[in-house]
């Protein structure tokens, strides 16, 4: 009986250590604050952020990431442009390297927009702190925008983000449980 109890205690302790390691070094929880990603992610929802996988697999256009906006705040936004991309918007239409891109995650907000446009017209060189002579995203930089463009504070306001600002890629939403979702890339977005 004592041996069986000891085995249970050791098993539970090992499980907690594994959970701690996973939570500390692989996946961390994050609570969505604000409406900048609405309706994809809503205020108060909880997501799991993969803090290692994106470093080995890289970030792709369409990934949703959490990053350090400043010393006190982390933001969650969608990657629109990666290093080497030439990005521009013309009247709410995204062009990457000269090719028109679909943004299905904007469908809801386009239908319910308050003004003429939700994204507007801009090029990489128009962003704060960007090279005014180049529309190409430099190495180690990313262009990020919120899905709710009319309220989002994103690269249009603070410029491109540095790779070292990125905390990780959103892997899945786990709260509320009824809204569980594991992939936020454009081909898996329904709005």
From Swiss-Prot:
It is found in: Cell membrane. It is an enzyme of class 3 (hydrolase). It catalyses: Cleavage of hydrophobic, N-terminal signal or leader sequences from secreted and periplasmic proteins. InterPro entries: LexA/Signal_pep-like_sf, Pept_S26A_signal_pept_1, Pept_S26A_signal_pept_1_CS, Pept_S26A_signal_pept_1_Lys-AS, Pept_S26A_signal_pept_1_Ser-AS, Peptidase_S26. It is a single-pass type II membrane protein. Residues 29-191 are extracellular. Residues 1-7 are cytoplasmic. One of its GO terms (molecular function) is serine-type endopeptidase activity. One of its GO terms (biological process) is signal peptide processing. The keyword Chloroplast does not apply. SUPFAM superfamilies: LexA/Signal peptidase (SSF51306). Its EC number is 3.4.21.89. The active site is at residues 36, 77. The keyword S-adenosyl-L-methionine does not apply. GO terms for cellular component: plasma membrane. The chain crosses the membrane at residues 8-28. Keywords: Cell membrane, Hydrolase, Membrane, Protease, Transmembrane, Transmembrane helix. Its main location: membrane. Essential for cell viability. Belongs to the peptidase S26 family. This is Signal peptidase IB.
């Amino acid at each position: 009986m004592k041996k069986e109890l000891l085995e249970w205690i050791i098993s539970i302790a090992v499980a907690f250590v594994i959970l701690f390691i996973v939570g500390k070094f692989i996946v961390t929880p994050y609570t969505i604050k604000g409406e900048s990603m609405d309706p994809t992610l809503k205020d108060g929802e909880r997501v799991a952020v993969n803090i290692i996988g994106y470093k080995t697999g890289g970030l792709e256009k369409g990934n949703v990431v959490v990053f350090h906006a400043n010393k006190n705040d982390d933001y969650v936004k969608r990657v629109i442009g990666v290093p080497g991309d030439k990005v521009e918007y013309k009247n709410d239409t995204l062009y990457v390297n000269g090719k028109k891109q679909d943004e299905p995650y904007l469908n809801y907000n386009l239908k319910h927009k308050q003004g003429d446009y939700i994204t507007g017209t801009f090029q990489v060189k128009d962003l704060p702190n960007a090279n005014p002579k180049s529309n190409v995203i430099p190495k180690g930089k990313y262009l990020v925008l919120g899905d709710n463009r009319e309220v989002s504070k994103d690269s249009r306001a603070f410029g491109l983000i540095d790779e070292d600002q990125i905390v990780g890629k959103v892997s899945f939403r786990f709260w509320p449980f009824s809204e569980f979702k594991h992939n936020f890339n454009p081909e898996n977005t329904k709005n």
